[in-house]
């Protein structure tokens, strides 16, 4: 436990030092920052804010987790799988950000390219993961999927990777939402005695807390796709490594809600010839524009943050209660 906590403290301190250096480099190199293409007027002031800050907490967390696990003899197949997903999905996000920032391609990777790279990473992940079994936990009951587990694994990894990416649209929202989710999985890992997974979790929590100091409103830096895609993939990988896949539907209710809102909006828009359910999706923008109803007073970014963090915290506590108190 001491090793895991130490890993978290080290990544926190490294990120605390690394982010200002990253921002300074970004400014000195005169790199064009985040472009704003949203209809939320208050976001226009954020244009030019340095992005790709997720690169800092990703590198520090992966390296610290790797070396701490290695030298404490806790490096395992689980640790390797989770770090692999972090690196690979981080690379996909980095390429996407690179095209947007340096090549001025607003779309970055097109959806097919991004999906292909995410699926490739998922397949490689499965080749290692299958050693751990092909059993899917459905609300605590084992379901043997055999070869078909690969299809679930790909859906889980790609789905939650993109879901966290969609959530990253308000200052600080995604970073603390993931901290809450990881904290819940940290408890599960500790109870299961999987200290290797706990080490990776605490390392990332430390990195995210260090990043949040510069990412809360008004954000001095954004994590970019390099951070959000990696974090979503990490959550999916951890849920599988702990054989508690179903828990991510509750622990990750914020990401599920954000993604579902987009799917509902697009489907309803097509079916009705242009009508909308929400004022704007992902749904956190709906709240920004008009509160819960969409017709009330606009919510500040802090209010949106605390609402979603509260939902995420309650969902995480509910999951732990279901697992260990019922």
Curated annotation (Swiss-Prot):
InterPro entries per the UniProt record, alphabetical: Glycosyl_transferase_4, PNAcMuramoyl-5peptid_Trfase, PNAcMuramoyl-5peptid_Trfase_CS
Transmembrane segment boundaries: 3-23, 51-71, 79-99, 115-135, 138-158, 169-189, 195-215, 221-243, 306-326
PROSITE patterns: MRAY_1, MRAY_2
GO cellular component: plasma membrane
Reactions that this protein is recorded to catalyse: UDP-N-acetyl-alpha-D-muramoyl-L-alanyl-gamma-D-glutamyl-L-lysyl-D-alanyl-D-alanine + di-trans,octa-cis-undecaprenyl phosphate = Mur2Ac(oyl-L-Ala-gamma-D-Glu-L-Lys-D-Ala-D-Ala)-di-trans,octa-cis-undecaprenyl diphosphate + UMP
Pathway: Cell wall biogenesis; peptidoglycan biosynthesis
Cofactors demanded by this protein: Mg(2+)
Compartments reported by the entry: Cell membrane
EC number, UniProt record: 2.7.8.13
GO terms for biological process, alphabetical: cell division; cell wall organization; peptidoglycan biosynthetic process; regulation of cell shape
Pfam families: Glycos_transf_4 (PF00953), MraY_sig1 (PF10555)
Keywords: Cell cycle, Cell division, Cell membrane, Cell shape, Cell wall biogenesis/degradation, Magnesium, Membrane, Metal-binding, Peptidoglycan synthesis, Transferase, Transmembrane, Transmembrane helix
Major subcellular location class: membrane
Domain of life: Bacteria
Membrane topology: Multi-pass membrane protein
Top EC group: transferase
PANTHER family: PHOSPHO-N-ACETYLMURAMOYL-PENTAPEPTIDE-TRANSFERASE, PHOSPHO-N-ACETYLMURAMOYL-PENTAPEPTIDE-TRANSFERASE HOMOLOG
Function of the protein: Catalyzes the initial step of the lipid cycle reactions in the biosynthesis of the cell wall peptidoglycan: transfers peptidoglycan precursor phospho-MurNAc-pentapeptide from UDP-MurNAc-pentapeptide onto the lipid carrier undecaprenyl phosphate, yielding undecaprenyl-pyrophosphoryl-MurNAc-pentapeptide, known as lipid I.
HAMAP family: MraY (MF_00038)
Family of the protein in this entry: Belongs to the glycosyltransferase 4 family. MraY subfamily.
Protein name from the UniProt record: Phospho-N-acetylmuramoyl-pentapeptide-transferase
Protein source organism: Streptococcus pneumoniae (strain P1031)
């Amino acid at each position: 436990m001491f090793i895991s906590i130490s890993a978290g403290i080290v990544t926190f301190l490294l990120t605390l030092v690394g982010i200002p250096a990253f921002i300074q480099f970004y400014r000195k190199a005169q790199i064009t920052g985040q472009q704003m293409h949203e209809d939320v007027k208050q976001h226009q002031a954020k244009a030019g804010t340095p992005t790709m800050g997720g690169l800092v907490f990703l590198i520090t967390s992966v390296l610290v987790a790797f070396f701490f696990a290695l030298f404490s003899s806790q490096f395992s197949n689980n640790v390797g799988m989770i770090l692999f997903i972090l690196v690979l999905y981080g690379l996909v996000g980095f390429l996407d950000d690179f095209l947007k920032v340096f090549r001025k391609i607003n779309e970055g990777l097109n959806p097919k390219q991004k999906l292909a790279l995410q699926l490739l990473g998922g397949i490689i992940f499965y080749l290692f993961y299958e050693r751990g079994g092909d059993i899917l936990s459905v609300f605590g009951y084992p379901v043997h999927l055999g070869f078909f587990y690969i299809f679930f694994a790909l859906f889980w990894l790609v789905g939650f990777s993109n879901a966290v990416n969609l959530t990253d649209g308000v200052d600080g929202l995604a970073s603390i939402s993931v901290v809450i989710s990881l904290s819940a999985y940290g408890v599960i890992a500790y109870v299961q005695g999987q200290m290797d997974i706990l080490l990776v979790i605490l390392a990332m929590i430390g990195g995210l807390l260090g990043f949040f100091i510069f990412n809360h409103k008004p954000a001095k830096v954004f994590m970019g796709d390099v951070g959000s895609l990696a974090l979503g993939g990490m959550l999916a990988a951890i849920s599988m490594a702990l054989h508690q896949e179903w828990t991510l539907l509750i622990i990750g209710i914020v990401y599920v809600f954000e993604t579902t809102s987009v799917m509902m909006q697009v489907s309803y828009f097509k079916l009705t010839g242009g009508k909308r359910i929400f004022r704007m999706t992902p749904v956190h923008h709906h709240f920004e524009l008009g509160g819960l109803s969409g017709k009330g007073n606009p919510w500040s970014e802090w209010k949106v943050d605390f609402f979603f963090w509260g939902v995420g915290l309650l969902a995480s506590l509910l999951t732990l209660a279901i697992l260990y108190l019922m």
